[in-house]
């Protein structure tokens, strides 16, 4: 807020990332209120949160929390081909600016394969309530079981003051005698489980 106050006439757009790669969600409502108080729009890089609208078990989506626009990478958490993404807005002024810029900078030869994949993905999401319910039920079951591990810790909402995406299974090895990368290696070689990412702890 200090930056917005100091540069009130210069800052027209604030960009934040939420959720993080690990699933932590920012307080978008408070951030959007601060931005709007100073005349700035809020764009959220919601790349890892494209699935949020499809279950109450997930955090609320950015546009519902006051963001003016959001970028969603469908391919990260939904069934869509790599490179597919959406830029969404509920702000008419931004919508006009986006349309004008797309007319200038967008390719005249878009990939119909990727656009078709987006359509297929959106159709799946609109007609798969049962699948999302089952997915969230499985996530909660797995998370409850992982809480019983003696030396490995699974992160959840109780570990942060912010909202958290239960779809991110983040496990800490800080209290174990192996590193995160070593655990990933064991899971891969011994159990054929491939982790998406591994850090030192």
Which residues does each PLM region occupy?
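Conserved C-terminal alpha-helix-loop-beta "cap" of PLP-dependent enzymes
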Residues: 141-201
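Conserved PLP-enzyme active-site core in the AAT-like
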Residues: 1-156
């Amino acid at each position: 807020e200090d930056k917005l106050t100091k540069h009130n006439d210069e800052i027209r757009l604030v960009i934040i990332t939420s959720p993080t790669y690990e699933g932590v969600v920012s307080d978008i409502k408070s951030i959007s209120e601060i931005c709007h108080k100073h005349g700035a729009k809020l764009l959220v890089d919601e790349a890892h949160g494209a699935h949020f609208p499809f279950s109450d078990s997930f955090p609320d989506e950015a546009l519902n929390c006051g963001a003016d626009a959001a970028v969603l990478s469908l391919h990260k958490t939904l069934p869509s081909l790599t490179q597919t993404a959406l830029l969404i807005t509920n702000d008419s002024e931004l919508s006009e600016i986006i349309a004008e810029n797309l007319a200038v900078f967008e390719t005249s030869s878009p990939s119909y394969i990727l656009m078709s994949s987006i359509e297929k993905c959106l159709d799946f999401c609109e007609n798969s309530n049962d699948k999302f319910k089952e997915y969230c039920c499985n996530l909660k079951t797995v998370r409850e079981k992982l809480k019983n591990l003696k030396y490995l810790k699974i992160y959840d909402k109780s570990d942060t003051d912010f909202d958290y995406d239960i779809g991110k299974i983040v496990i800490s090895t800080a209290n174990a005698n192996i590193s995160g990368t070593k655990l990933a290696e064991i899971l891969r070689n011994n159990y054929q489980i491939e982790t998406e990412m591994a850090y030192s702890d």
